[in-house]
């Protein structure tokens, strides 16, 4: 009778570890992306120049603000 209990506890521990690991990794990645966004002003300026646009600082600031606001909304909606 102790054998099946040991097997059951091992399975429960594995499932608990997987779920806990998933949520810890998810939180770590969200914090990492918030601190180190995947795109910065210099990358945005280069992309606009490659598309044939002349990037002004005002336009770059608007796009960065829009991207940051979008990322914040996505993080808030994923927390629910």
Curated annotation (Swiss-Prot):
It is a single-pass membrane protein. It is found in: Membrane. Keywords: Membrane, Transmembrane, Transmembrane helix. It comes from the Bacteria. GO terms for cellular component: plasma membrane. The keyword Transmembrane applies. The chain crosses the membrane at residues 4-24. InterPro entries: EF-hand-dom_pair, UPF0154. Pfam families: UPF0154. This is UPF0154 protein SH1564. It comes from Staphylococcus haemolyticus (strain JCSC1435).
